[in-house]
């Protein structure tokens, strides 16, 4: 699962800045930045929050074969 793509796509679809998205998830701006740049992956609890938001906003969590 490509969390950097998912986090950025979700945040963009929600029309939020990294700071606003960080507040919504209860993490720091730096954490969102690290996720989007692929330096770190979200911990399990944050992955669950992201998955719920992805479902709400119609974002696929798994990559399709043609996207690989």
Label each region the model flagged.
Residues 44-63:
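DNA major-groove recognition helix of helix-turn-helix/homeodomain DNA-binding modules
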